[in-house]
Amino acid sequence: MKPGPRNLITDVEGLHVGNADDGSVKSGVTVLAADRPITASVHVMGGAPGTRETDLLAPDKLVPAVDALVLSGGSALGLDAASGVANALRAAGIGFDVAGQKVPIVPAAILFDLLNGGDKGWDENPYAALGAAAWRARSETFALGTAGAGTGATAGALKGGLGSASA
């Protein structure tokens, strides 16, 4: 198989990715969204997974599609990034219709980046604002590596980051 023209997930027509990060916190958020709600699925694994709304992705659930997917640093605190994205979606009139109200469906997963040397002594959780900023930044082209959710990612003592590919 040959990769798409950008070799990014956004080679799939209608997909967009946005990143936002905070260099002092050494953490960030990545949002995957589409021009219309998308079908999604998940396999949760690991010793201490952190997720939000992933149970909705089971085929026997009421919600048939999602409005965006969020990946965030910040461990459990990073789950608040999905609230920032959901607020931005709702303001744009996007979401699952419930009696005339829009309820954005935004599953999220986090990674543990609390021990990477960034300033985690903040008083107000920065992740909702980072989520909203990542939503506003969505595009067909986006940074890889130390960007978005990959900003503070590590694998043991090795630097991690955000990756993407297409086929």
Locations of regions flagged by a protein language model:
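Alpha/propeptide regions of enzymes that mature by internal proteolysis
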Residues: M1-A167
